[in-house]
Amino acid sequence: MDGGYSWLSLAQGVFNTQVNRWDRSSCNGGLRWQIYAYQAGYELKNTISNGGLFQLSARLARYTNNHTYSDWAERIWDWMASTPLMENTTWNVADSTQVGDSCTSQGNNQWSYNYGTMLSGAAYMYAHVCLSSSPLALETN
């Protein structure tokens, strides 16, 4: 990249920006779909926003072996599994949930890109944890 920055520093900058948007004030966490209250999607938390951060965290964990990133990937996965966004018995991945009802309902739409984002992030976490030669990774499997 020009300007003395690396792709890694760009990815880390995006990660830092996104985790600062983690919204603990509603639904016990998660990213809102849009960032400004006047936008129609502000009242939604959706899979692509949270799944994108999950995937980025998992990829950074794999690339850097920094536990901050793997901790965030686990936090995002666990949060999504605690909401209607990701049903961890049927593996239904919903598009969105409403902040107004404390994220207890889901939008009926399912999109393949949401599944792809979650599968990719899960694959990076698998590679980070299970394919690592570090003793810590072997102990946690």
Please give the residue ranges for each predicted region.
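Glycan-recognition and catalytic cores of secretory/periplasmic carbohydrate-active enzymes
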Residues: M1-N141
